[in-house]
Amino acid sequence: MRTAQALPLFVLMMVGCGGGPMEPVPAQPLVPPAASALPVWSRMELPILPDNVRHDTLLVHTTYDLGEGRFLMAAQHNDYNREGIRLYLYRPEPDSSAAIIAWSKPGYDSETMLPTFFTTGNRADGLVIIANMGERQSWGQEAFWLKDDGIRSLGFLNVAVREWRTLDDSTYQFRTSIAPRTEVRGQDGTFEFSFTGDSLQLYDDLQGRMEVMMPASMVRYRYEGTWQLWLEGRLVAPPPAS
């Protein structure tokens, strides 16, 4: 009973000395705002098709049928200029030429731009595309939003899956595509990209650390007018430009 009576007095004394009760410090959000409210975009499996156009200046890598007479191809100029591979939205013409509708930002020295597609099932929402970049290993994924005959770049998923492979008598680290482990949510131009599995490799945590291994559930990217990296439930601010 004495302890129960003394405790309120002690609290009152602390309040009196401090000039009033202290305001509680708001906790950092554990997830980006309204993360759970964003609808899920489902993976859309599109087979790679044979080339259906002839183009004098483009070397076609892969072709996909998006429906309604529109196709997407990953292609590069056959003079191998520095901009490298891109995604092209087009309609095939009767003479086998391509009527180009839109194109993505270039992949520069990447030798691959293998796309993975996500959809809400409503064509009006467009498609979210993540395109794997790399040469022999994955460098990460460029995220695009294909909507209204345009291909908008959202940002870069700077992550890959790390695997260990034994060749002859030596074991090597390989970085492979994160696409099979990527989940997409989005609505009205806001998108979130999260990852499944045990762990992933983050190439740059924007805090001075490179090639960091992290639990996959702790890494998230968000697009809401700007591209954001969230780690362990907190927004990471990139260092100021020097």
List the predicted regions and their residue ranges.
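Terminal domain-start segments
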Residues: 20-113
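C-terminal motif of bacterial Sec signal peptides marking the signal peptidase cleavage site
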Residues: 14-16
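Acidic, small-residue rich beta-repeat scaffolds with periodic aromatic anchors
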Residues: 18-56, 143-159, 164-242
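Extracellular-facing segments of soluble proteins and assemblies that are Gly/Ser/Thr-biased and enriched
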Residues: 111-146
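Structural signature of eukaryotic scaffold interfaces centered on beta-propeller domains
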Residues: 53-68, 114-124, 175-187
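Short, solvent-exposed loop/turn segments at conserved positions within beta-propeller repeat blades
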Residues: 78-85, 135-139, 211-215
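Sec-dependent signal peptide recognition
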Residues: 2-9
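Short beta-strand elements that form the blades of beta-propeller/WD-repeat-like
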Residues: 69-78, 123-135, 186-196
